[in-house]
Swiss-Prot record:
Region (C): 549-684
Family: Belongs to the heat shock protein 90 family.
Organism: Porphyromonas gingivalis (strain ATCC 33277 / DSM 20709 / CIP 103683 / JCM 12257 / NCTC 11834 / 2561)
Organism domain of life: Bacteria
Stretches the record annotates as A: 1-329
Subcellular location: Cytoplasm
Record note on quaternary structure: Homodimer.
A GO cellular component entry from the record: cytoplasm
Cytoplasm keyword on record: yes
GO terms of molecular function: ATP binding; ATP hydrolysis activity; ATP-dependent protein folding chaperone; unfolded protein binding
Entry-linked InterPro entries: HATPase_C_sf, Hsp90_fam, Hsp90_N, Ribosomal_Su5_D2-typ_SF
Protein name: Chaperone protein HtpG
Matches recorded under CDD domains: HATPase_Hsp90-like (cd16927)
Length: 684
């Protein structure tokens, strides 16, 4: 006899709320319905094992089918089924009261839901205008019933014609969700959400190419692997098994470097396999490759908050029933089990890396370039991981040799300790662009390491804090004598006028570029040293590099690159430039320089007159005289600078020296490089 009733919820109509609330994630309805079918099947297996069901279990599988014409998706199982009383209890009361409770709890925190795991049967209404449940219990003498609801609080319950035990969920898809009537869409969702469920999931037949088109075969199309690699014992798996499982997860990826098999049952349940991929030099492209499962049911691939941030660079699967899924991320991060799981995974990762380093260092070194970004990220973001990684982190020198922290310190401290007792680690970030600086350091007996990774600027700053009496200096940040200061700087023997003259001469020929700023500096580097070279101050350059990954440091990222054009005042060519200016320009500057001297003497007298007086007490005549003096000085200095600039523009030696320095630092390109080549040919 047909029966009508009202669902026991307080909302007038909960279904529009369900649709609206979870609209962006409505595709998970299929996972929920199929998972329920798997649960029903597993319950039958359990009842059979304890003797409560003595009948033939037969072929235990879940079947999914799509009828595009009838606009239905049907999920069928041969599990425990339900009696009429159970339908009343579990669908009309428990399921929908749970729905209402769930929606009320998270109405203000919608974005915080991680997997929407456990939404259950009512998720079918996210895509359906009507849902039919046709079910028959495994119990003897049970009769089949059909429950129907069109999205209003009313339902009908009536006898049904169903010979076998189990349940059919028939979803009549509404117009807004017609996309789910495409077989390709459903197969894709099953492949994502149901790939490793514990009961075979069948979706149609396998196909083959025949007679010019794809045609069904007689073989069932089983979507899932019911016994994936992570559920097996490590002793039962070979390397090829792990690699094959990786290929099933990431078909287009390169082969992993190695892996960790997780298998914990106390004090929490955790299984899984984590793979170390070949990480490219870009953090952002690597994330969200770990898949989280709960008893082999896919939950999410967004595992931030469940594992430490740096571990999101790994690939693989984590399966745990002890991770709370329908909670906010802030709750996740404070959950005791999650903290324990997170710490355990970090420890296992560090254990695995240290094990390979100790037992097979050649292999570890061979794979270091692909591991380095991951290890650095972990060291920067997780203190406990840093403590472990300090044992196997490797520096790489310019010849490709690799050293641990202790090994490298032993190598360099004899010759690379400065006058203050600091061990100076020299490094380059561009093997070719900084070659000349690296060569100067090597010729002096220094070792230079290569730090050209995305996170290296941050690692350098971290290691300066962690390693005792250690300072990192890029090879192009100063002259070779000053990179590792063994003694005080040699005195530069130039007068103030000579300094000012050289500054003006070389500034006149420096490139004009808003993104680059050059400062002329002087060093006494000996007659055998280079005449001119370009350095880049360590602090500002490092801040700019770090700003690329830290939004809060954007101020540094917006500043122009700052370089020092260092003139070796002991070199004959610098002396030649200065001597040439004295012969060619200074005679015409004698009167102007004398005038400047007179103006400065007059300025000093005017300043003396102002001493001890308030601004209002200074005579107007004195103020006017001071202003006129400043104008005249600027005018006279301008005349001097104009003549020096003209001389510099016509002087090929100055241009050649600057371009040689730019070329040595990789800064001479385009038209300037072409002009340098033409000038070099003229000079030859």
């Amino acid at each position: 006899m047909s029966k009508k009733g009202t669902i026991g919820v307080t909302s007038d109509n909960i279904f529009p709320v369900i649709k609206k609330f979870l609209y962006s994630d409505h595709k998970i309805f299929l996972r929920e319905i199929v998972s329920n079918a798997v649960d029903a099947t597993q319950k039958l297996k359990t009842l059979t094992s304890v003797g409560e069901f003595k009948g033939e279990t037969g072929d235990l599988r879940v079947t999914v089918s799509v009828d595009e014409v009838a606009r239905t998706i049907t999920v069928s199982d041969r599990g425990v089924g339900m009696t009429e009383e159970e339908v009343e209890k579990y669908i009309n009361q428990i399921a929908f009261s749970s729905a209402e409770e769930f929606l009320e709890k998270y109405k203000d925190d919608k974005a915080a839901i991680i997997g929407h795991f456990g939404l259950g049967f009512y998720s079918a209404f996210m895509v359906s205008e009507r849902v039919d449940v046709i079910t028959r219990s495994f119990r003897e003498d049970a009769t089949a019933v059909k429950w129907s609801c069109d999205g209003s609080p009313e339902y009908t319950l009536e006898p049904a014609d169903k010979a076998d035990r189990g349940t059919d969920i028939v979803m009549h898809i509404d117009e807004e969700n017609s996309e789910f009537l495409k077989k390709e869409k459903i197969e894709g969702l099953l492949g994502k959400y149901c790939k490793f469920l514990t009961v075979p999931i069948i979706f149609g037949k396998k196909q083959e190419w025949k007679d010019g088109k794809m045609q069904d075969t007689d073989e069932d199309n089983q979507i899932n692997d019911t016994h994936p690699a992570w559920t097996k014992k490590p002793a039962d798996l070979k390397d090829e098994d792990y690699k094959e499982f990786y290929r099933s997860l990431y078909p287009m990826s390169e082969e992993p470097l190695f892996w960790i098999h997780l298998n914990v049952d106390y004090p929490f349940n955790l299984t899984g396999i984590l793979y170390f991929p070949k990480i490219k030099n870009n953090l952002d492209l690597q994330r969200n490759k770990i898949q989280l499962y709960c008893n082999q049911v896919y939950v999410t691939d967004e595992v931030q908050g469940i594992v430490p941030d740096f571990l999101t660079l790994l690939h693989g699967v984590i399966d745990s029933p002890d991770i709370p899924l329908n909670v906010s991320r802030s709750y996740l991060q404070s959950d005791a089990n999650v903290k324990k799981i997170s710490s355990h995974i970090t420890k296992k990762v560090a254990d695995r890396l240290e094990e390979i380093f100790k037992n097979d260092r050649p292999t570890f070194e061979e794979k270091w370039d692909s591991l380095k970004l991951f290890v650095e990220y972990g060291m920067l973001t997780d203190e406990k991981f840093y403590e472990r990684a300090a044992k196997f982190f490797l520096f790489t020198d310019m010849d490709g040799h690799k050293y641990t922290f202790d090994e490298y310190r032993t190598l360099v401290e004899g010759v690379q300790t400065d006058k203050d007792g600091q061990v100076v680690y020299l490094y380059a970030t561009d093997k070719h662009g900084q070659y000349s600086h690296v060569k100067r350091a090597s010729d002096k007996g220094y070792s230079v390491m290569l730090l050209d990774g995305q996170l290296d600027p941050h690692i350098v700053s971290l290691l300066e804090q962690k390693l005792e009496k250690t300072h990192f200096v890029r090879v192009d940040s100063d002259t070779i004598n000053n990179l590792i200061r063994k003694e005080e700087r040699a005195e530069v023997k130039l007068s103030d006028t000579e300094r000012a003259t050289l500054v003006k001469l070389f500034e006149a020929r420096l490139p004009r570029d808003e993104k680059k700023h050059f400062n002329v500096a002087f060093e006494s580097l000996g007659a055998e040293g280079e005449a001119i070279l370009i350095t880049q101050a360590e602090f500002m350059r490092r801040m700019r590099d770090m700003a690329q990954l830290q939004p809060g440091m954007s101020f540094y990222g917006e500043l122009p690159d700052s370089y020092n054009l260092v003139l070796n005042t002991d070199h004959p060519l610098i002396d030649k430039v200065l001597s040439g200016e004295k012969e060619s320009v200074e005679p015409s500057l004698t009167e102007l320089r004398a005038k400047i001297a007179e103006l400065k003497t007059e300025e000093a007298k005017l300043l003396d007159e102002e001493k001890g007086k308030k601004p209002e007490e200074i005579p107007v005549a004195t103020k006017e005289a001071k202003e006129n003096n400043a104008v005249e000085q600027a005018k006279t200095e301008g005349s001097i600078n104009d003549q020096l600039t003209k001389y510099a523009q016509d002087n090929e030696l100055i241009g050649q020296l600057i371009d040689l320095a730019l070329l040595g630092s990789g800064l001479l390109t385009g038209e300037a490089l072409a002009e340098f080549i033409r000038r070099s040919q003229r000079l030859l």
